[in-house]
Amino acid sequence: MGSKSPEGHRQTPDASNSSELKPANPNPKPARNGSQSADLDGGNLDDDNDDDGEANEEAGVKTSADSTDKKKKRKRSKKKTKKGTLPLKQSSPPRVLVSSLFPSGYPIGECVPYQDDNTSRTTDEELRYNSRLWDKDFLDEYRQAAEIHRQVRQYAQNELIKPGASLTTIAEGIEDGVRALSGHQGLEPGDGFKAGMGFPTGLCLNNVAAHWTPNPGAKDVFLDKSDVLKVDFGVHVNGRIVDSAFTVAFDHTYDNLLTAVKEATNTGIMHAGIDARVSEIGAAIQEVMESYEVEIAGKTHPVKAIRNITGHDILRYNIHGGKQVPFIKNDRPDKMEEGEVFAIETFGSTGRGVLHDDVGLCLSNVFSKANAPQVGVYGYGRNTDVSGANLRLSSAKNLLKTIDANFGSLVFCRRYLERLGVEKYHLGMRHLIDNGIVEYYEPLVDVKGSYTAQFEHTILLHNGGKEVISRGDDY
Protein backbone atom coordinates (compact mmCIF):
# COMPACT_ATOMS: atom_id res chain seq x y z
CA MET A 1 0.00 0.00 0.00
CA GLY A 2 1.75 3.13 -1.23
CA SER A 3 2.57 5.97 1.14
CA LYS A 4 1.37 9.28 -0.24
CA SER A 5 4.07 11.89 -0.67
CA PRO A 6 4.40 14.62 0.50
CA GLU A 7 3.39 13.72 4.05
CA GLY A 8 -0.30 12.93 4.24
CA HIS A 9 -2.84 10.35 5.38
CA ARG A 10 -0.26 8.20 7.15
CA GLN A 11 -0.72 6.27 10.35
CA THR A 12 1.36 7.78 13.13
CA PRO A 13 4.05 5.25 14.08
CA ASP A 14 3.94 3.87 17.58
CA ALA A 15 7.49 4.34 18.77
CA SER A 16 7.14 1.61 21.35
CA ASN A 17 6.62 -0.95 18.59
CA SER A 18 9.83 -0.27 16.74
CA SER A 19 11.95 -1.79 19.48
CA GLU A 20 10.17 -5.09 18.95
CA LEU A 21 11.66 -5.57 15.51
CA LYS A 22 14.56 -7.88 16.19
CA PRO A 23 17.20 -9.06 13.71
CA ALA A 24 16.86 -12.65 12.64
CA ASN A 25 19.30 -15.51 12.40
CA PRO A 26 22.30 -14.17 10.44
CA ASN A 27 22.58 -17.47 8.57
CA PRO A 28 19.06 -18.20 7.32
CA LYS A 29 18.21 -21.37 5.44
CA PRO A 30 17.88 -21.26 1.65
CA ALA A 31 14.69 -19.71 0.35
CA ARG A 32 11.65 -21.77 -0.50
CA ASN A 33 9.52 -19.69 -2.80
CA GLY A 34 5.92 -20.02 -3.86
CA SER A 35 2.94 -21.54 -2.16
CA GLN A 36 1.96 -24.78 -3.87
CA SER A 37 5.56 -25.90 -4.27
CA ALA A 38 6.12 -25.42 -0.56
CA ASP A 39 2.84 -26.93 0.64
CA LEU A 40 4.24 -30.42 1.09
CA ASP A 41 7.45 -29.40 2.84
CA GLY A 42 5.90 -29.57 6.30
CA GLY A 43 4.60 -33.14 6.23
CA ASN A 44 6.69 -35.55 4.16
CA LEU A 45 9.99 -35.93 5.97
CA ASP A 46 8.75 -38.33 8.64
CA ASP A 47 7.08 -40.63 6.10
CA ASP A 48 10.31 -40.91 4.11
CA ASN A 49 12.31 -41.79 7.24
CA ASP A 50 9.79 -44.48 8.21
CA ASP A 51 10.03 -46.07 4.77
CA ASP A 52 13.81 -46.17 5.01
CA GLY A 53 13.62 -47.81 8.43
CA GLU A 54 11.15 -50.38 7.18
CA ALA A 55 13.36 -51.19 4.21
CA ASN A 56 16.34 -51.86 6.51
CA GLU A 57 14.20 -54.03 8.76
CA GLU A 58 12.93 -55.99 5.79
CA ALA A 59 16.50 -56.78 4.74
CA GLY A 60 16.93 -58.85 7.94
CA VAL A 61 13.79 -61.00 7.50
CA LYS A 62 14.53 -64.80 7.38
CA THR A 63 11.17 -66.43 6.49
CA SER A 64 8.50 -65.53 3.98
CA ALA A 65 5.78 -66.01 6.63
CA ASP A 66 7.42 -63.51 8.96
CA SER A 67 7.88 -61.16 6.05
CA THR A 68 4.20 -61.39 5.17
CA ASP A 69 3.15 -60.69 8.77
CA LYS A 70 5.44 -57.69 9.04
CA LYS A 71 4.26 -56.30 5.72
CA LYS A 72 0.67 -56.58 6.87
CA LYS A 73 1.46 -54.78 10.09
CA ARG A 74 3.27 -52.04 8.21
CA LYS A 75 0.32 -51.63 5.86
CA ARG A 76 -2.14 -51.26 8.74
CA SER A 77 0.13 -48.79 10.50
CA LYS A 78 0.54 -46.73 7.34
CA LYS A 79 -3.21 -46.54 6.82
CA LYS A 80 -3.69 -45.38 10.39
CA THR A 81 -1.08 -42.63 9.90
CA LYS A 82 -2.68 -41.46 6.67
CA LYS A 83 -6.11 -41.33 8.29
CA GLY A 84 -4.86 -38.99 11.00
CA THR A 85 -2.77 -36.79 8.73
CA LEU A 86 -3.91 -33.21 8.24
CA PRO A 87 -4.53 -31.99 4.68
CA LEU A 88 -1.28 -31.28 2.87
CA LYS A 89 -2.87 -29.38 0.02
CA GLN A 90 -4.74 -26.10 -0.15
CA SER A 91 -8.36 -26.11 -1.26
CA SER A 92 -9.97 -23.92 -3.91
CA PRO A 93 -11.27 -21.49 -2.77
CA PRO A 94 -8.58 -21.46 -0.07
CA ARG A 95 -10.06 -22.54 3.26
CA VAL A 96 -7.40 -24.77 4.86
CA LEU A 97 -5.51 -23.12 7.71
CA VAL A 98 -1.88 -22.55 6.76
CA SER A 99 -0.95 -23.54 10.30
CA SER A 100 -2.18 -27.07 9.50
CA LEU A 101 -0.22 -27.15 6.24
CA PHE A 102 3.05 -26.16 7.93
CA PRO A 103 3.12 -27.75 11.41
CA SER A 104 6.93 -27.65 11.48
CA GLY A 105 7.33 -24.01 10.50
CA TYR A 106 6.60 -21.68 7.62
CA PRO A 107 8.69 -21.27 4.47
CA ILE A 108 11.54 -18.79 4.67
CA GLY A 109 11.40 -15.99 2.14
CA GLU A 110 14.04 -15.33 -0.49
CA CYS A 111 17.30 -14.59 1.34
CA VAL A 112 19.53 -12.07 -0.41
CA PRO A 113 23.00 -10.98 0.79
CA TYR A 114 23.67 -7.28 1.03
CA GLN A 115 25.49 -5.61 -1.84
CA ASP A 116 29.18 -4.89 -1.20
CA ASP A 117 28.75 -6.17 2.32
CA ASN A 118 31.65 -5.17 4.54
CA THR A 119 32.07 -8.23 6.73
CA SER A 120 34.38 -6.36 9.08
CA ARG A 121 31.58 -3.93 9.93
CA THR A 122 30.21 -6.39 12.49
CA THR A 123 32.49 -8.11 14.99
CA ASP A 124 32.06 -11.69 16.16
CA GLU A 125 30.93 -10.39 19.55
CA GLU A 126 28.26 -8.25 17.89
CA LEU A 127 27.08 -11.23 15.86
CA ARG A 128 26.69 -13.30 19.02
CA TYR A 129 24.78 -10.45 20.66
CA ASN A 130 22.50 -10.02 17.65
CA SER A 131 21.77 -13.75 17.47
CA ARG A 132 20.53 -13.61 21.08
CA LEU A 133 18.08 -10.90 20.02
CA TRP A 134 16.56 -13.13 17.36
CA ASP A 135 12.80 -13.11 17.92
CA LYS A 136 11.40 -16.41 16.66
CA ASP A 137 7.77 -15.37 17.18
CA PHE A 138 8.36 -12.27 15.08
CA LEU A 139 9.72 -14.35 12.20
CA ASP A 140 7.06 -17.07 12.47
CA GLU A 141 4.30 -14.47 12.38
CA TYR A 142 5.77 -12.70 9.39
CA ARG A 143 6.37 -15.93 7.49
CA GLN A 144 2.86 -17.15 8.24
CA ALA A 145 1.41 -13.88 6.93
CA ALA A 146 3.58 -14.16 3.82
CA GLU A 147 2.45 -17.72 3.11
CA ILE A 148 -1.19 -16.68 3.44
CA HIS A 149 -0.53 -13.87 0.97
CA ARG A 150 1.11 -16.24 -1.53
CA GLN A 151 -1.65 -18.83 -1.39
CA VAL A 152 -4.49 -16.32 -1.61
CA ARG A 153 -2.97 -14.36 -4.47
CA GLN A 154 -2.31 -17.60 -6.36
CA TYR A 155 -6.00 -18.42 -6.05
CA ALA A 156 -6.90 -14.89 -7.16
CA GLN A 157 -4.61 -15.08 -10.20
CA ASN A 158 -5.88 -18.51 -11.25
CA GLU A 159 -9.58 -18.29 -10.43
CA LEU A 160 -10.78 -14.76 -9.71
CA ILE A 161 -9.00 -12.29 -11.98
CA LYS A 162 -10.53 -12.81 -15.40
CA PRO A 163 -12.19 -10.56 -18.00
CA GLY A 164 -15.79 -10.02 -17.00
CA ALA A 165 -15.15 -10.56 -13.29
CA SER A 166 -16.69 -8.16 -10.81
CA LEU A 167 -14.15 -6.20 -8.76
CA THR A 168 -16.35 -6.72 -5.71
CA THR A 169 -16.17 -10.49 -6.25
CA ILE A 170 -12.38 -10.31 -6.58
CA ALA A 171 -11.97 -8.21 -3.43
CA GLU A 172 -14.28 -10.36 -1.33
CA GLY A 173 -12.69 -13.55 -2.66
CA ILE A 174 -9.25 -12.35 -1.59
CA GLU A 175 -10.42 -11.17 1.82
CA ASP A 176 -12.45 -14.31 2.53
CA GLY A 177 -9.36 -16.36 1.71
CA VAL A 178 -7.11 -14.35 4.02
CA ARG A 179 -9.52 -14.66 6.93
CA ALA A 180 -10.05 -18.39 6.36
CA LEU A 181 -6.34 -19.22 6.10
CA SER A 182 -5.48 -17.16 9.17
CA GLY A 183 -8.33 -18.68 11.18
CA HIS A 184 -9.74 -15.31 12.24
CA GLN A 185 -12.93 -13.94 10.73
CA GLY A 186 -12.68 -10.65 12.63
CA LEU A 187 -16.37 -10.57 13.55
CA GLU A 188 -15.83 -10.45 17.31
CA PRO A 189 -14.16 -7.52 19.12
CA GLY A 190 -10.41 -8.10 19.26
CA ASP A 191 -10.36 -11.02 16.81
CA GLY A 192 -9.14 -8.81 13.97
CA PHE A 193 -6.03 -7.95 15.99
CA LYS A 194 -4.90 -11.59 16.05
CA ALA A 195 -4.71 -12.04 12.27
CA GLY A 196 -6.46 -11.08 9.06
CA MET A 197 -6.42 -8.22 6.58
CA GLY A 198 -3.62 -5.70 6.99
CA PHE A 199 -5.58 -3.16 4.94
CA PRO A 200 -8.42 -3.29 2.38
CA THR A 201 -7.79 -4.93 -0.98
CA GLY A 202 -6.81 -2.31 -3.54
CA LEU A 203 -8.06 -2.98 -7.08
CA CYS A 204 -7.00 -0.10 -9.29
CA LEU A 205 -7.69 0.06 -13.03
CA ASN A 206 -5.63 1.79 -15.71
CA ASN A 207 -4.88 5.42 -14.73
CA VAL A 208 -6.02 4.80 -11.14
CA ALA A 209 -2.72 3.95 -9.48
CA ALA A 210 -3.59 3.41 -5.83
CA HIS A 211 -6.21 3.53 -3.08
CA TRP A 212 -9.38 2.27 -4.73
CA THR A 213 -11.56 -0.54 -3.46
CA PRO A 214 -15.19 -1.48 -4.19
CA ASN A 215 -17.58 -0.14 -1.59
CA PRO A 216 -21.28 -0.50 -0.79
CA GLY A 217 -23.51 1.93 -2.63
CA ALA A 218 -21.26 2.27 -5.66
CA LYS A 219 -21.96 0.77 -9.06
CA ASP A 220 -20.00 -2.44 -9.44
CA VAL A 221 -17.09 -2.41 -11.88
CA PHE A 222 -16.33 -5.34 -14.18
CA LEU A 223 -12.88 -6.23 -15.46
CA ASP A 224 -12.31 -5.80 -19.19
CA LYS A 225 -9.67 -7.61 -21.25
CA SER A 226 -8.15 -4.21 -22.14
CA ASP A 227 -7.70 -3.19 -18.48
CA VAL A 228 -4.49 -2.98 -16.48
CA LEU A 229 -5.32 -4.05 -12.92
CA LYS A 230 -3.21 -3.39 -9.81
CA VAL A 231 -3.89 -5.80 -6.94
CA ASP A 232 -2.55 -4.61 -3.57
CA PHE A 233 -3.50 -6.28 -0.29
CA GLY A 234 -1.98 -6.83 3.11
CA VAL A 235 -2.02 -9.76 5.52
CA HIS A 236 -1.14 -9.51 9.17
CA VAL A 237 -0.51 -12.00 11.95
CA ASN A 238 -0.35 -10.45 15.40
CA GLY A 239 0.20 -7.03 13.80
CA ARG A 240 3.09 -8.14 11.56
CA ILE A 241 1.91 -6.85 8.19
CA VAL A 242 3.01 -8.27 4.85
CA ASP A 243 2.35 -5.72 2.11
CA SER A 244 2.68 -7.01 -1.45
CA ALA A 245 1.19 -6.05 -4.82
CA PHE A 246 1.19 -7.13 -8.45
CA THR A 247 -0.27 -6.02 -11.78
CA VAL A 248 -2.31 -8.02 -14.29
CA ALA A 249 -2.79 -7.16 -17.97
CA PHE A 250 -4.49 -9.47 -20.46
CA ASP A 251 -3.28 -7.48 -23.49
CA HIS A 252 0.41 -7.96 -24.36
CA THR A 253 0.54 -4.28 -25.37
CA TYR A 254 1.34 -3.48 -21.75
CA ASP A 255 4.05 -6.11 -21.23
CA ASN A 256 6.84 -3.53 -21.25
CA LEU A 257 5.04 -1.42 -18.66
CA LEU A 258 4.71 -4.37 -16.31
CA THR A 259 8.29 -5.48 -16.95
CA ALA A 260 9.62 -1.98 -16.27
CA VAL A 261 7.88 -1.75 -12.90
CA LYS A 262 8.70 -5.31 -11.85
CA GLU A 263 12.39 -4.80 -12.68
CA ALA A 264 12.35 -1.46 -10.89
CA THR A 265 10.97 -3.07 -7.75
CA ASN A 266 13.61 -5.82 -7.90
CA THR A 267 16.25 -3.12 -8.32
CA GLY A 268 14.97 -1.42 -5.18
CA ILE A 269 15.16 -4.71 -3.31
CA MET A 270 18.69 -5.31 -4.58
CA HIS A 271 19.90 -1.91 -3.34
CA ALA A 272 18.05 -2.04 -0.01
CA GLY A 273 19.99 -2.99 3.09
CA ILE A 274 21.45 -1.90 6.38
CA ASP A 275 22.86 1.66 6.10
CA ALA A 276 21.48 2.00 2.54
CA ARG A 277 20.42 5.56 1.70
CA VAL A 278 16.89 5.94 0.36
CA SER A 279 18.18 8.64 -1.99
CA GLU A 280 20.48 6.16 -3.73
CA ILE A 281 17.78 3.48 -3.84
CA GLY A 282 15.36 5.91 -5.47
CA ALA A 283 17.87 6.97 -8.10
CA ALA A 284 18.63 3.35 -9.02
CA ILE A 285 14.94 2.50 -9.30
CA GLN A 286 14.20 5.48 -11.53
CA GLU A 287 17.08 4.70 -13.87
CA VAL A 288 15.83 1.17 -14.48
CA MET A 289 12.15 2.02 -14.82
CA GLU A 290 12.62 4.95 -17.18
CA SER A 291 14.78 2.90 -19.55
CA TYR A 292 11.55 1.31 -20.84
CA GLU A 293 8.89 2.55 -23.24
CA VAL A 294 5.49 1.26 -24.32
CA GLU A 295 3.84 1.44 -27.73
CA ILE A 296 0.07 1.92 -27.51
CA ALA A 297 -2.04 2.34 -30.65
CA GLY A 298 1.02 3.23 -32.69
CA LYS A 299 2.29 5.87 -30.26
CA THR A 300 5.38 5.40 -28.09
CA HIS A 301 5.09 6.36 -24.42
CA PRO A 302 8.09 6.47 -22.07
CA VAL A 303 7.50 4.74 -18.75
CA LYS A 304 7.75 7.32 -15.98
CA ALA A 305 8.40 6.65 -12.32
CA ILE A 306 5.53 8.17 -10.35
CA ARG A 307 6.86 10.98 -8.21
CA ASN A 308 4.45 11.54 -5.34
CA ILE A 309 3.88 8.10 -3.88
CA THR A 310 6.55 6.04 -2.14
CA GLY A 311 7.56 2.80 -0.52
CA HIS A 312 7.70 2.87 3.27
CA ASP A 313 8.73 1.11 6.43
CA ILE A 314 6.16 -0.97 8.32
CA LEU A 315 5.59 -0.97 12.07
CA ARG A 316 3.47 -3.31 14.13
CA TYR A 317 -0.21 -2.68 13.32
CA ASN A 318 0.89 0.37 11.29
CA ILE A 319 1.22 -0.05 7.54
CA HIS A 320 2.99 3.30 7.13
CA GLY A 321 5.87 3.97 9.49
CA GLY A 322 8.00 7.08 9.68
CA LYS A 323 10.32 6.42 6.71
CA GLN A 324 9.55 6.73 3.01
CA VAL A 325 11.38 5.20 0.05
CA PRO A 326 10.78 7.27 -3.11
CA PHE A 327 11.44 5.65 -6.46
CA ILE A 328 12.90 8.76 -8.04
CA LYS A 329 16.18 10.57 -7.50
CA ASN A 330 15.93 12.52 -4.24
CA ASP A 331 17.98 14.09 -1.48
CA ARG A 332 16.40 12.45 1.56
CA PRO A 333 18.99 11.77 4.30
CA ASP A 334 17.23 8.67 5.68
CA LYS A 335 19.05 5.36 5.95
CA MET A 336 17.70 1.87 6.43
CA GLU A 337 18.58 0.22 9.73
CA GLU A 338 19.02 -3.32 10.95
CA GLY A 339 15.82 -4.92 12.20
CA GLU A 340 13.54 -2.71 10.13
CA VAL A 341 10.78 -3.91 7.81
CA PHE A 342 10.18 -2.17 4.49
CA ALA A 343 7.61 -2.32 1.72
CA ILE A 344 9.65 -1.85 -1.44
CA GLU A 345 7.17 -0.84 -4.11
CA THR A 346 7.27 1.06 -7.35
CA PHE A 347 4.66 2.58 -9.63
CA GLY A 348 5.20 3.35 -13.30
CA SER A 349 2.97 5.31 -15.66
CA THR A 350 2.54 6.10 -19.34
CA GLY A 351 1.08 9.45 -18.27
CA ARG A 352 2.56 12.40 -16.39
CA GLY A 353 3.95 10.35 -13.53
CA VAL A 354 2.21 12.55 -10.96
CA LEU A 355 -0.87 11.45 -9.02
CA HIS A 356 -3.73 13.53 -7.70
CA ASP A 357 -6.76 12.81 -5.53
CA ASP A 358 -9.70 12.02 -7.78
CA VAL A 359 -12.71 13.97 -6.54
CA GLY A 360 -14.81 12.30 -9.21
CA LEU A 361 -14.09 8.83 -7.86
CA CYS A 362 -14.36 10.11 -4.31
CA LEU A 363 -17.46 12.27 -4.96
CA SER A 364 -17.08 16.01 -4.49
CA ASN A 365 -19.87 16.04 -1.92
CA VAL A 366 -18.29 13.50 0.41
CA PHE A 367 -17.89 16.08 3.14
CA SER A 368 -20.84 18.31 2.27
CA LYS A 369 -23.44 19.17 4.86
CA ALA A 370 -25.69 16.58 3.23
CA ASN A 371 -23.35 13.90 4.62
CA ALA A 372 -23.63 11.79 1.47
CA PRO A 373 -22.19 8.26 1.62
CA GLN A 374 -18.44 8.28 0.98
CA VAL A 375 -18.72 5.95 -1.99
CA GLY A 376 -15.29 6.60 -3.43
CA VAL A 377 -13.13 6.81 -0.30
CA TYR A 378 -10.69 3.90 -0.28
CA GLY A 379 -10.28 3.53 3.45
CA TYR A 380 -9.90 5.06 6.88
CA GLY A 381 -7.21 4.95 9.53
CA ARG A 382 -7.36 5.74 13.23
CA ASN A 383 -5.05 8.57 14.29
CA THR A 384 -3.84 7.12 17.59
CA ASP A 385 -2.31 10.45 18.63
CA VAL A 386 -5.73 12.10 18.93
CA SER A 387 -8.09 11.19 21.76
CA GLY A 388 -11.83 10.91 21.34
CA ALA A 389 -12.55 11.82 24.95
CA ASN A 390 -14.15 15.15 24.07
CA LEU A 391 -16.54 13.86 21.42
CA ARG A 392 -20.12 14.96 21.95
CA LEU A 393 -21.94 13.35 19.06
CA SER A 394 -23.23 9.94 20.19
CA SER A 395 -22.97 8.40 16.71
CA ALA A 396 -19.30 9.43 16.55
CA LYS A 397 -18.62 7.99 20.02
CA ASN A 398 -20.22 4.67 19.14
CA LEU A 399 -18.41 4.47 15.81
CA LEU A 400 -15.07 5.20 17.49
CA LYS A 401 -15.69 2.39 19.99
CA THR A 402 -16.29 0.01 17.08
CA ILE A 403 -13.14 1.18 15.30
CA ASP A 404 -10.97 0.85 18.41
CA ALA A 405 -12.39 -2.59 19.26
CA ASN A 406 -12.05 -4.08 15.79
CA PHE A 407 -9.35 -2.24 13.81
CA GLY A 408 -7.21 -0.07 16.08
CA SER A 409 -4.60 1.51 13.82
CA LEU A 410 -5.21 -0.97 10.96
CA VAL A 411 -6.69 0.65 7.86
CA PHE A 412 -10.30 -0.36 7.16
CA CYS A 413 -13.04 0.45 4.66
CA ARG A 414 -16.82 0.78 4.52
CA ARG A 415 -17.24 -2.86 3.52
CA TYR A 416 -15.54 -3.86 6.75
CA LEU A 417 -17.85 -1.68 8.86
CA GLU A 418 -20.98 -3.04 7.20
CA ARG A 419 -19.66 -6.59 7.55
CA LEU A 420 -19.76 -5.96 11.32
CA GLY A 421 -23.37 -4.81 11.04
CA VAL A 422 -22.63 -1.10 11.51
CA GLU A 423 -25.36 1.13 10.06
CA LYS A 424 -25.90 4.88 9.59
CA TYR A 425 -22.28 5.73 10.30
CA HIS A 426 -21.74 8.51 7.74
CA LEU A 427 -22.44 11.45 10.07
CA GLY A 428 -20.32 9.90 12.82
CA MET A 429 -17.45 9.28 10.39
CA ARG A 430 -17.63 12.85 9.17
CA HIS A 431 -17.38 14.05 12.78
CA LEU A 432 -14.37 11.82 13.51
CA ILE A 433 -12.59 13.08 10.40
CA ASP A 434 -13.35 16.72 11.21
CA ASN A 435 -11.81 16.23 14.66
CA GLY A 436 -8.65 14.59 13.30
CA ILE A 437 -9.42 11.28 15.01
CA VAL A 438 -9.76 9.39 11.73
CA GLU A 439 -7.87 10.01 8.49
CA TYR A 440 -9.13 8.99 5.07
CA TYR A 441 -7.49 7.81 1.87
CA GLU A 442 -8.73 8.95 -1.53
CA PRO A 443 -8.08 7.24 -4.87
CA LEU A 444 -4.86 8.46 -6.52
CA VAL A 445 -4.91 8.81 -10.30
CA ASP A 446 -2.76 9.92 -13.21
CA VAL A 447 -4.17 11.67 -16.30
CA LYS A 448 -7.11 10.08 -18.06
CA GLY A 449 -6.07 7.69 -20.83
CA SER A 450 -2.80 6.72 -19.16
CA TYR A 451 -1.90 3.32 -17.72
CA THR A 452 -0.15 2.59 -14.44
CA ALA A 453 1.44 -0.52 -12.95
CA GLN A 454 2.66 -1.53 -9.50
CA PHE A 455 4.79 -4.28 -7.97
CA GLU A 456 5.66 -4.53 -4.29
CA HIS A 457 7.38 -6.79 -1.77
CA THR A 458 7.96 -6.72 1.97
CA ILE A 459 11.55 -7.21 3.11
CA LEU A 460 13.08 -7.88 6.53
CA LEU A 461 16.54 -6.46 7.21
CA HIS A 462 18.38 -9.23 9.05
CA ASN A 463 21.93 -8.92 10.31
CA GLY A 464 23.42 -11.12 7.60
CA GLY A 465 21.11 -10.31 4.70
CA LYS A 466 17.61 -9.29 3.69
CA GLU A 467 14.67 -11.65 3.52
CA VAL A 468 12.18 -10.91 0.76
CA ILE A 469 9.41 -12.33 2.88
CA SER A 470 6.62 -12.08 0.28
CA ARG A 471 8.57 -13.49 -2.69
CA GLY A 472 6.83 -16.26 -4.61
CA ASP A 473 7.04 -18.14 -7.88
CA ASP A 474 4.76 -15.55 -9.49
CA TYR A 475 6.82 -12.40 -8.82
Curated annotation (Swiss-Prot):
Keywords (A to Z) from UniProt: Aminopeptidase, Cytoplasm, Hydrolase, Metal-binding, Protease
Region (Disordered): 1-97
PANTHER family, alphabetized: METHIONINE AMINOPEPTIDASE 2, METHIONINE AMINOPEPTIDASE 2-2
Ligand binding (substrate): 211, 320
Gene Ontology BP term (one): proteolysis
Biased composition regions of type Acidic residues, renumbered to the chain: 44-57
Keyword Cytoplasm: yes
Protein name in UniProt: Methionine aminopeptidase 2-1
Residues annotated for a divalent metal cation 1 binding in this entry: 232, 243, 456
Bias-annotated ranges (Basic and acidic residues): 1-12
Compartments reported by the entry: Cytoplasm
EC numbers for this chain: 3.4.11.18
Co-factor binding details: Binds 2 divalent metal cations per subunit. Has a high-affinity and a low affinity metal-binding site. The true nature of the physiological cofactor is under debate. The enzyme is active with cobalt, zinc, manganese or divalent iron ions. Most likely, methionine aminopeptidases function as mononuclear Fe(2+)-metalloproteases under physiological conditions, and the catalytically relevant metal-binding site has been assigned to the histidine-containing high-affinity site.
Chain sites annotated for binding a divalent metal cation 2: 243, 312, 345, 456
Molecular function, one GO term: metalloaminopeptidase activity
Essential cofactor(s): Co(2+); Zn(2+); Mn(2+); Fe(2+)
Family: Belongs to the peptidase M24A family. Methionine aminopeptidase eukaryotic type 2 subfamily.
Reaction catalyzed: Release of N-terminal amino acids, preferentially methionine, from peptides and arylamides
Function noted in UniProt: Cotranslationally removes the N-terminal methionine from nascent proteins. The N-terminal methionine is often cleaved when the second residue in the primary sequence is small and uncharged (Met-Ala-, Cys, Gly, Pro, Ser, Thr, or Val).
A GO CC annotation given for this chain: cytoplasm
